[in-house]
């Protein structure tokens, strides 16, 4: 059973007074049946509404005619102030209208109209003799500004005033029936059988003369004039305040349609000025035959005219220039007389201009809501104008037409069934071309049509969705998905105009596509020619694979373009193009072959690029022709981009046909051909997508919920022993592994899919399945440390360049080098395996540096797997489109490198973080528990410390302190584990850890909060478990300084010569004791000297050595070996002067920088032997110990380089007086750079001595002195 999710809630929100209907939707078939019933119900109800509206308007009009009680204010009349000649005149107000008064009530007074600037208020503007009273300013002087308004504009002003913004006149009369008369020379002469003033009559005479001049000009003008730009603001040819488009008969086809078309379709020569009747009567209420036409030849008798009364269209756009020609709307057709429910159905097919109810079918104009009225702009593309239906077929009417580039062209009107009927465009903009692909109504239009559309992969449409730019939502509904059987002639005309625009868009798109195919073919011919030579770039087989079916596709579309281009150029509405689309659809089999080969072609192209630098250069620089308007005649494209073009093209084939069919009348000869082409295209896409309906369900996790991205990050994949950087995306139904393609200048990111696994097929491998899996190749620590040193050095160079204000080229070069080194470090450092297994038998291994991240990925995948129930497979097209979408969906936009950080981002903390892990609560049962600590360093997380295991408890109290070195760190993570001594207790995932992760959490290291160097307590919550911590931070500028000795007793902080003299020994006792204990039981301890010891144990040992406690050896035997190693490091760190002394430290730094190996060895050995005796012997003793530790590297993972990294700064770091650090610690970048330089030097000095095979002993004389003399 299909659950209509959200339907009831949405229904109640929309219709709170009614209960939602019950729908039994058990299958897709039930949904389709319910949809058909809904459509049928809407058609029936719309038919009934149209019929009732027909009857209502007829009765309203009949009642108005009988009572002669039209609202005068609605028709623009006010009680005018007495003119000098005493005549009563109609005048217009430009102010906001008030609601119509009730019957018998006097309307409120009116203000005098004010002159308004261009483009303000009513589009019609004030017109001499019509829109202004004679006494208004400058009303009599308008003759010098241009010809007076046309009669059509004069009459349409009444409607403008009705919808204007004026206040009713002070002494306006009650509404009454209006009848006006005009003479062919004198213009308006009577209103309700009362003569008008001489001034009105003279202005009317001027208007009639102007009409005749324009008619003669229009009959003889060239078609080319129609290409003039649409009127904006005040006309350059006429300053009378009337829309220039309406003044020019040729420029404005709407003027022709509204005013020059006879309702009876009889023969009528255009603009015959000498055959007018002396007087004509205008029936305002019912719009008699002469209405809306201006002075025309009347070949019918009065009785014939009365037989065909028409109800005019209503002008709903009070702020549009295009309303200037709009006719009169009687009160009966106003939306104000409809209830809200009636207005909801005012978008039906009946909403059109209609002839008399006794002769023609009734139509009503489209409705707009008041809010839409208020927002209608001068560019409104919905100019409603009254139109009669027929004209003589020999009277050519030229219309302005918008193409996709906004150029006005000319075209002939489509004659319907040979009757020469003119079909008015109710929506298409003639004054302003509608936007090509305008999105104003696009979403609404797509929603209306989605029921009829087949499933297409979600990709942007290449075909235009043409819709009027300023069209209101009520206009948009008329072109809805439910095609009414009563399609009006106006809709037919609109569709045919749209059809030309759609075809123009297809033609432009086809031209671009051909240029891309040409760019693909361009290198193919020379490559084929070179394949037969002794030095081929590619083999013939490789060329055939990469460019498979590209020549055939080019020929198919070249033939299609060559056939379509002349037909669009010689356009008429009778033009047929359906055969071209039908033939194109019949050749889609070539695309089938191309799509099937696409994945192989891409893989082959990538391999060839890697193997052949010449081909790689060619594939990245393919030139395709640009648009004519582009500055550069060609654009650079990669081979991968161009090979995807046909795949993208074929997925959009049905969208183009849908648009074309939507605007092709069913009676047009092209309609069946286009339908056949659409059917072929739909079947083709369905066959490619392999039973597309089940896949759509599998591609959604829940009903109505589409695939979404849950998590993504950069990870290292182990492929045949090699490390590869990948960007991994976790979607709601699959795991996708991609490779970030190399980017050339200015190009956007692109991804290449390596593999994917549906979540229903994914599992995590167990250790039993991994017996044959090889060990993970680990990178030696010294290599990683060397990379870190290089990175620090490059960062220092970048800062030096910035401070020196040198050119950006050097800085950019260094930044590029830094990015390469950081990327290499990120690639080489992870060593923790994260393996996923597919049901088809394939396994994939990722390397992660943090168990926290590994656990997070597992949790997210397992949580999502609970919602996935069905396996599926993606076609190459779907996979490519999904991969392309990753660019927009990704949340991690760049590799986590410090070079990618913004300048204003925090550089992180450098120094030492002391962490005390106190206790944890929230465990449900007693277990053996321990915690580990991770911090981020150089863009990735590493494990830094581990507590002891607290056995058999649900509330462990560790109270252990750790000192963690921070290198640009921003986050501290803690993970809590249950130690599993029974190996079979839990599955050994990844063949790595046998311990169970109980919880994980993290805390941000805020520099502001940690700067006071005081202990701060915090609680980290994780899965119901709470761990209590205390943290304290010592920044690098403080930790680098050695404090001078303030005491002469004890061991720590006392000069080494003083200690050895007091102890009468060559090497301090603390050094000998710690080394002996470590060599006894710590040589195979993983990470010895690198893993932090428990701080409390270290402090206890420190106190014992300081007071010369005789039980110190007993204490050491009971303590963790890492605490003993920590105590030894602490002793050397707290020496008031480094073991290599402040005096010789600069010399050691200079000696290690020598390039000549012989000179370096001589210098370094001489410096070493120049150290004070206690320092030298202690160092040699320690050096031998460290070399023995490194011999166990295979077990303890401590190489010579690792040991040098740990002890270098400890043994050589200068004291405060010799530190090269700046005195001002408020410069973190400078401090960090100085530290990096010193650390590099210190590590290299110690590493040099560790790597020397033998260090010569001091000479015998000195030896005897050193070992015999008591100090």
UniProtKB/Swiss-Prot annotation:
GO CC annotation terms, alphabetical? axon; cytosol; dendritic spine; extracellular exosome; glutamatergic synapse; membrane; plasma membrane; postsynaptic density
Matches recorded under InterPro entries: Abr/Bcr, Bcr-Abl_oncoprot_oligo, Bcr-Abl_oncoprot_oligo_sf, C2_dom, C2_domain_sf, DBL_dom_sf, DH_dom, GDS_CDC24_CS
Q: Which UniProt keywords apply?
A: Acetylation, ATP-binding, Cell projection, Chromosomal rearrangement, Coiled coil, GTPase activation, Guanine-nucleotide releasing factor, Kinase, Methylation, Nucleotide-binding, Phosphoprotein, Proto-oncogene, Serine/threonine-protein kinase, Synapse, Transferase
| In-chain residues carrying the UniProt-annotated modification Omega-N-methylarginine | 471
Upper taxonomic lineage: Eukaryota, Metazoa, Chordata, Craniata, Vertebrata
Domain C2, first and last residues per copy: 893-1020
Basic and acidic residues bias: start-end ranges: 185-198, 441-451
Q: Where is the Rho-GAP domain?
A: 1054-1248
Task: Enumerate the subcellular locations listed in this protein's record, separating them with semicolons.
Answer: Postsynaptic density; Cell projection, Dendritic spine; Cell projection, Axon; Synapse
Q: Where is this region: Kinase?
A: 1-426
All copies of the PH domain together span 708-866
Which intervals of the chain form a coiled coil? Answer: 28-55
Instruction: Output this protein's name.
Output: Breakpoint cluster region protein
**Organism this protein belongs to:** Homo sapiens (Human)
């Amino acid at each position: 059973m299909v659950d209509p999710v959200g339907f009831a809630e949405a229904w109640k929100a929309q219709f709170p007074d009614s209960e939602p209907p019950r729908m039994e939707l058990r299958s897709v078939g039930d949904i389709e049946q319910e949809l058909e019933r809904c459509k049928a119900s809407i058609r029936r109800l719309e038919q009934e509404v149209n019929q009732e509206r027909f009857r209502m308007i007829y009765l309203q009009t009949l009642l108005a005619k009988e009572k002669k009680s039209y609202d005068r204010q609605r028709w623009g009349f006010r009680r005018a102030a007495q003119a000098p000649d005493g005549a009563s005149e109609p005048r217009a107000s430009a102010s906001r209208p008030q609601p119509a008064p009730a019957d018998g009530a006097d309307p409120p007074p009116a203000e005098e109209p004010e002159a308004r600037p261009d483009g303000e208020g009513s589009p019609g503007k004030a017109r001499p003799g019509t829109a202004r009273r004679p006494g208004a300013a400058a009303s009599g002087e308008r003759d010098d500004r241009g010809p007076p308004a046309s009669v059509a504009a004069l009459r349409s002003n009444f409607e403008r005033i009705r919808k204007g913004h004026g206040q009713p006149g002070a002494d306006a009369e009650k509404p009454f029936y209006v009848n006006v008369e005009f003479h062919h020379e004198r213009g308006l002469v009577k209103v309700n059988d009362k003569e008008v003033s001489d001034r009105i009559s003279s202005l009317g005479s001027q208007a009639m003369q102007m009409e005749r001049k324009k008619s003669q000009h229009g009959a003889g003008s060239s078609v080319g004039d129609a290409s003039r730009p649409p009127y904006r603001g005040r006309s350059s040819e006429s300053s009378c305040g009337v829309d220039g488009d309406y003044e020019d008969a040729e420029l404005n086809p709407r003027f022709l349609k509204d005013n020059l078309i006879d309702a009876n379709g009889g023969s009528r020569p255009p603009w015959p000025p000498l055959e007018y009747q002396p007087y004509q009567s205008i029936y305002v209420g019912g719009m008699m035959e002469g209405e809306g036409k201006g002075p025309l030849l009347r070949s019918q008798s009065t009785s014939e005219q009365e037989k065909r009364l028409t109800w005019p269209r209503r002008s709903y756009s009070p702020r549009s220039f295009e309303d200037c020609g709009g006719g009169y709307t009687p009160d009966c057709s106003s939306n104000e007389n409809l209830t809200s429910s009636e207005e909801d159905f005012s978008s039906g097919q009946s909403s059109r201009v209609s002839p008399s109810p006794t002769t023609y079918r009734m139509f009503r104009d489209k409705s707009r809501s008041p809010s839409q009225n208020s927002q209608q702009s001068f560019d409104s593309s919905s100019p409603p104008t009254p139109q009669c239906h027929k004209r003589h077929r020999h009277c050519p009417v030229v219309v302005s037409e918008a193409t996709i580039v906004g150029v006005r062209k000319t075209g002939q009107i489509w004659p319907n069934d040979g009757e020469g009927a003119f079909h008015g465009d109710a929506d298409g903009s003639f004054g302003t071309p509608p936007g090509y692909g305008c999105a104003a109504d696009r979403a609404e239009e797509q929603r209306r049509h989605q029921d009829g559309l087949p499933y297409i992969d979600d990709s942007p449409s290449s075909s235009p969705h043409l819709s009027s730019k300023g069209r209101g939502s009520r206009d948009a509904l008329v072109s809805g998905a439910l095609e009414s059987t009563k399609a009006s002639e106006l809709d037919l005309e609109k569709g045919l105009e749209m059809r030309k625009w759609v075809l123009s868009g297809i033609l432009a798109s086809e031209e671009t596509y051909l240029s891309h195919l040409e760019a693909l073919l361009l290198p193919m011919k020379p490559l084929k020619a070179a394949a037969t030579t002794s030095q081929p770039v590619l083999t013939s087989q490789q060329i055939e694979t990469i460019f498979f079916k590209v020549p055939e596709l080019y020929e198919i579309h070249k033939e299609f373009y060559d056939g379509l281009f002349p037909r669009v150029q010689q356009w008429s509405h009778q033009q047929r193009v359906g055969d071209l689309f039908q033939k194109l659809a019949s050749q889609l089999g070539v695309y089938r072959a191309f799509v099937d080969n696409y994945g192989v072609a891409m893989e082959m192209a990538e391999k060839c690029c890697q193997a052949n630098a010449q081909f790689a250069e060619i594939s990245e620089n393919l030139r395709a022709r640009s648009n004519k308007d582009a500055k550069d005649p060609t654009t650079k494209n990669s081979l991968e981009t161009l090979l995807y073009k046909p795949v993208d093209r074929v997925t959009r084939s049905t969208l183009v046909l849908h648009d074309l069919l939507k605007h092709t009348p069913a009676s047009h000869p092209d309609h069946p051909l286009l339908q056949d082409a659409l059917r072929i295209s739909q079947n083709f896409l369905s066959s490619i997508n392999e039973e597309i309906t089940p896949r759509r369900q599998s591609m959604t996790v829940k009903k109505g919920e589409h695939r979404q991205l849950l998590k993504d990050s950069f990870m290292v994949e182990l492929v045949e022993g090699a490390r590869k950087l990948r960007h991994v995306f976790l979607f709601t139904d699959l795991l996708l592994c991609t490779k970030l393609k190399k980017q050339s200048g200015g190009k956007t990111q692109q991804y290449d899919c390596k593999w994917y696994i549906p979540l229903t097929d994914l599992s995590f491998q167990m250790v039993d399945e991994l017996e044959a899996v090889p060990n993970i190749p680990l990178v030696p620590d010294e290599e990683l440390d060397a990379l870190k040193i290089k990175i620090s050095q490059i960062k220092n160079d970048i800062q030096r360049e910035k401070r020196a204000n040198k050119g950006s080229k050097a800085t950019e070069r260094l930044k590029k080098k830094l990015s390469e080194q950081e990327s290499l470090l990120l690639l080489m450092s992870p060593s923790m395996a994260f393996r996923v297994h597919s049901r088809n038998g394939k396994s994939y291994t990722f390397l992660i540096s943090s168990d926290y991240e590994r656990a997070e990925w597992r949790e997210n995948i397992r949580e999502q797997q609970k919602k996935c129930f069905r396996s599926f497979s993606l076609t190459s097209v779907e996979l490519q489109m999904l991969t392309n979408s990753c660019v927009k969906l990704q949340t991690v936009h760049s590799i986590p490198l410090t070079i990618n950080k913004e300048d204003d981002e925090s550089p992180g903390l450098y120094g030492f973080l002391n962490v005390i892990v106190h206790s944890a609560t929230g465990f449900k049962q007693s277990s053996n528990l321990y915690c580990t600590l991770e911090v981020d360093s150089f863009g990735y997380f590493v494990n830094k410390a581990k507590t002891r295991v607290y056995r058999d408890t649900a509330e462990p109290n560790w109270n252990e302190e750790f000192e963690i070195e921070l290198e640009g760190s921003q986050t501290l993570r803690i993970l809590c584990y249950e130690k599993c001594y029974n190996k079979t207790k839990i599955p050994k995932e990844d063949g790595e850890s046998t311990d169970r992760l109980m919880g994980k959490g993290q805390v941000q290291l805020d520099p502001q909060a940690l700067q006071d160097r005081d202990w701060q307590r915090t609680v980290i919550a994780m899965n119901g478990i709470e761990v209590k911590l205390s943290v304290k931070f010592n920044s690098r500028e403080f930790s680098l300084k050695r404090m001078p000795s303030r005491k002469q007793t004890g061991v720590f902080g006392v000069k080494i010569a003083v200690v050895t003299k007091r102890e009468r020994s060559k090497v301090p006792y603390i050094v000998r004791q710690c080394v002996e204990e470590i060599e006894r039981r710590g040589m195979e301890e993983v990470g010895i000297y690198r893993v932090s010891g428990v701080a409390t144990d270290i402090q206890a040992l420190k106190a014992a050595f300081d007071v010369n406690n005789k039980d110190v050896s007993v204490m050491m035997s009971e303590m963790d070996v890492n605490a003993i190693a920590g105590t030894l490091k602490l002793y050397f760190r707290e020496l008031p002067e480094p073991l290599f002394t402040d005096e010789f430290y600069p010399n050691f730094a200079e000696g290690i920088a020598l390039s000549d190996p012989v000179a370096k060895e001589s210098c370094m050995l001489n410096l070493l032997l120049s150290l004070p005796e206690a320092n030298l012997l202690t160092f040699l003793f320690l050096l031998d110990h460290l070399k023995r530790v490194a011999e166990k590297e295979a077990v303890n993972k401590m190489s010579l380089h690792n040991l040098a990294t740990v002890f270098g700064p400890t043994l050589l770091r200068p004291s405060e007086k010799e530190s090269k650090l700046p005195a001002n610690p408020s410069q973190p970048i400078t401090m960090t750079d100085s530290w990096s330089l010193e650390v590099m030097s210190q590590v290299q000095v110690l590493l040099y001595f560790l790597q020397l095979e033998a260090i010569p002993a001091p000479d015998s004389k000195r030896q005897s002195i050193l070992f015999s003399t008591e100090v």
